[in-house]
Amino acid sequence: MSRVAALLAILLAASAAAAAALIILPAPSKSLAFVAIAAGEKSVFILALAVVGAVLALFASRPGTRLLAMLAVLLCLAATVVALVPFAQALRVASEQRVDLNFSRYLRSHIDTEGPIKAKKTVVFAELPQQGGTRSLGMDVYVPSGTLRPAPPAEPSRAIVVAHGGGWSAGDRGDASLASQWFADHGFTVFDVEYRTSPQPNWKGATGDVKCAIGWIKRHATTPDWNIDPGRITLLGRSAGGHLALLAAYAPNDARLPSSCPEGSGPDTSVESVVAYYAPTDLVWGYEHPVRKQVYDSSEKLRKFIGGTPETTGDLYRVLSPTERATAAAPRTLLIHGGRDQFVGRQHLDMLADKLHAVAVPYETLIIPYAQHGFDFVFGGLSGQIAEAVVLR
């Protein structure tokens, strides 16, 4: 019986140690990089697994199983120490940012997938001509519920326009529906927009679709259906969507990046502020310095998105780089990044922050040391809670 308990303890200890290793070591593959997101954001469960394994190992320690039990205890101790690191770092950042964390919500945190959200509506904002017919572009709209931050009914709400991630070639609106609903619960009207991810190269269409959505929202802002303040629109994007958000915000009236709406963008597509989660900002640098090619080949992603390399289409890489487009006229900017991002290096945040500082644009950065790329998709995780609170300010 003690031998079975010792083997079970080893199994639990090895599982905890393997999960903990993904917190501090580079992932060997893309699939394990996604597992690393959950490992870092749910590290308290690794801690629990390690504690159970250690207790079981001590219970099973007998002359014939002592070596196995000792090995299990050592693995559990190592996993415990590592599992505490992202938790402690999140507490430190929350304290620095004056964010009150909800630990009950943390224990209930889970992957943000689209579910039955009653407050959501879907509207078509563009009908684009394409071979064989037209292509409809839609946006999911989350209306303010007033659940957590009530506002007077007659007061126009602020709006958040969301551009999803997916390497410019995948993803869709609704990828972070719970986060969108959370912002709506806090008084925002949230528009989660669709943009074209194919065929590639699609740099012009994707950027133009985001601008088209902004123009549509501004045209309809004061209608009874929405009652939005058109001067208080925040553009928010994640990963590739963060790049598109920055580009649309920094070059609202650039003829090289026009709105894709058949009737034009209509109103000026400028926004009050822009928020970019773990976004590529210097595309030449990103092409030349992929973080981990076996996890995410940013060079190939950029080549397909733009239709060439920096050697063949260098001017276009610069036109599409937010670091090159930021001027004194750029809107207030919030840049958010995880320190352990294995898809988009944190250097992208640093380079854009330096440029914004140089041109005197109001900006803020939020770096969460042990957070991975896509950390906020663990809805309710500590890193996600910190980011939400900072965006809400």
Enumerate the predicted regions with their spans.
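Mobile cap/lid helix-loop segments that gate and shape the active-site cleft of serine hydrolases
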Residues: P26-F34, D112, L128, W285-R325
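Primarily recognizes the serine-hydrolase "nucleophile elbow" in alpha/beta-hydrolase
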Residues: C212-H289
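Catalytic nucleophile-loop/oxyanion-hole region of alpha/beta-hydrolase
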Residues: K42, G171-S180, F191-R232, V378-I386
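Catalytic histidine neighborhood in serine/cysteine hydrolases
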Residues: H357-G374
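N-terminal cap/lid segment of alpha/beta-hydrolase-fold proteins
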Residues: L22-A48, V93-P153
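Short beta-strand element of the alpha/beta-hydrolase
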Residues: P152-G166
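Short beta-strand/loop motif that positions the catalytic acidic residue
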Residues: A329, L335-H337, D341
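Conserved alpha/beta-hydrolase "acid-adjacent" motif
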Residues: Q342-M351
